[in-house]
Amino acid sequence: MFRVTSFNLNGIRAASRKGWLQWAADHNADVICVQEIKAQEKDLDASMRAIQGPRGELKGYFFPAQKPGYAGTAIYSLHPPLELFRGFGEAEFDDEGRYIEIDLGAFAVISLYVPSGSSSEERLASKFRFMRRFESHVKTLNHRGKPYVIAADWNVAHREIDLKNWRSNQRNPGFLPEERQWIEALIKEQGLRSEEHTS
């Protein structure tokens, strides 16, 4: 079975100091997608650039934000990609390193970090712009005809069951009706399937 794992690291260097690299090495994944790396590639040591797993090396492919110590995504893969895409053609979000994709031949894997929008009205407006533009990009992905996996920090709780205090969060970014409807549209109109497995 092909195994894809995803994590929001909240800083790859901090997570590595807390044992994340060893956990990732032991996890026996084919692909590991990470969000919020908060580091430039030049600042990563060799142990962070490639993970030595039980079946071989998972090479890291990185897309950091231009702003140091902020956002960024990466993908570690046991299998060499045929193509690598950094960004989805939207400068506002590509500058923040929010999308990286590898083409593995039979299918593609995407690591995605949706903005949270919680820090200010301006950032919430930016999140809504991201949502519209990413939905358009999903249509492009569908037209390509190649299966794909999106491993993401969506920064949206889709259903009431996904959030402990959903009633008190209905006016907060991350559980706004517009955000939940966006996730619903991606599933129903664009054909995305939502799956989550923990181990």
Language-model features: locations:
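Metal-dependent phosphoesterases centered on the DNase I-like endonuclease/exonuclease/phosphatase
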Residues: 52-59, 132-199
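Surface-exposed cleft-lining segments at the edges of enzyme active sites
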Residues: 89-90, 115-131, 167-172
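Active-site beta-strand/loop signature of hydrolases that rely on acidic residues for catalysis
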Residues: 7-8, 24-42, 109, 138-160, ...
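Active-site-proximal beta-strand elements of phosphoester/diester hydrolases
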Residues: 2-10, 106-118, 151
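Structured beta-strand-rich core segments of catalytic domains in phosphoester-bond hydrolases
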Residues: 38, 44-117
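Internal catalytic-core helix/loop-beta-alpha segment
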Residues: 86, 92-93, 125-142
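N-terminal, active-site-proximal structural segment of metallo-dependent hydrolase catalytic domains
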Residues: 1-51, 67-71, 186
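Short catalytic/ligand-binding loop motif for oxyanion handling, primarily in non-cytosolic enzymes
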Residues: 13, 41-43, 69-70, 118-121, ...
